[in-house]
């Protein structure tokens, strides 16, 4: 899973025993060489799906990390593009990754639960960040996103179908979450990262409570499971006009 240029086991251990913010500051220089980075195939599929409803004017990448979502927003947005993250280390890598982006791109250090914007965006995207939020934090998070979107704006993010109980992936994720719960019960500060806590039914309900109109769009690039359900969907939450 990790190449020779990725983090060592010791580096991952130090990260896991840190806070979320400090952990990602430490991991940032090697983050793009880990399996934690959202694959390009997912980014391209989301961009292709959103192109059918665009173009947009101003876009925000929520919890942008090292800037993987930047290419999606620059393809879709005619105006400004902003990345927001609370890790200074991740933002530093993002700035270095796109040095020629110019004034059209801005990077802002802030907590997604207290965004420093007014209704300034037509599109908000996020990739692979929701495991860092506990279920009880979703109402506040989605209310924040609703507040920074202009009327008619969209909040979009991909969701992969969970693995079946009979597959190794199911037990791997179950084991990871169990280890993290034990770690957080015994060690401070906590490191919030749970793969199985972000459940689509709960997410849709909380988005609607925050005032969004929610649609689920299959991402056909990833095919369907044996029961006919999509392997991947894009959640599109629209702020009413």
Please annotate each region the language model reported.
Residues 60, 66-114:
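Class I SAM-dependent methyltransferase SAM/SAH-binding core
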Residues 212-223:
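Conserved S-adenosyl-L-methionine
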Residues 223-241:
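Core SAM-dependent methyltransferase catalytic element
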Residues 125:
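A conserved beta-strand element that flanks and buttresses the S-adenosyl-L-methionine
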Residues 139-151:
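A short glycine-rich, Lys/Arg-flanked "PGG" loop and its adjoining helix->strand segment in the class I
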Residues 186-200:
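Acceptor-substrate binding/catalytic loop of class I
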Residues 1-54, 72, 156-180:
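Conserved class I S-adenosyl-L-methionine
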């Amino acid at each position: 899973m990790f190449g020779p240029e990725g983090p060592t086991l010791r580096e991952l251990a130090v990260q896991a025993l840190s806070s979320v913010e400090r952990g990602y500051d430490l991991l940032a220089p090697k983050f793009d060489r880990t399996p934690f980075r959202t694959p390009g195939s997912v980014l391209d599929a989301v961009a292709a799906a959103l192109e059918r409803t665009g173009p947009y004017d101003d876009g925000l990448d929520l919890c942008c990390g090292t800037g993987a979502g930047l290419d999606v927003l620059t393809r879709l947005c005619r105006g400004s593009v902003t990345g927001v993250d609370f890790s200074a280390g991740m933002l530093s890598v993002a700035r270095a990754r796109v040095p020629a982006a110019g004034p059209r791109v801005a990077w802002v250090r802030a907590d997604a639960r207290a965004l420093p914007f007014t209704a300034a965006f037509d599109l908000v995207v996020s990739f692979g960040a929701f495991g860092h939020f506990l279920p009880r934090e979703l109402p506040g998070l989605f209310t924040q996103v609703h507040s920074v979107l202009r009327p008619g704006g969209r909040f979009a993010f991909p969701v992969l179908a969970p693995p079946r109980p009979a597959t190794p992936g199911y037990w791997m994720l179950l084991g990871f979450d169990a280890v993290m719960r034990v770690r957080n019960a015994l060690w401070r500060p906590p490191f919030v990262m749970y793969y199985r806590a972000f459940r689509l039914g709960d997410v849709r309900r909380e988005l609607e409570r925050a005032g969004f109109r929610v649609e689920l769009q299959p991402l056909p690039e990833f095919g369907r499971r044996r029961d006919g359900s999509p392997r991947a969907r894009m959640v599109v939450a629209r702020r009413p006009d």
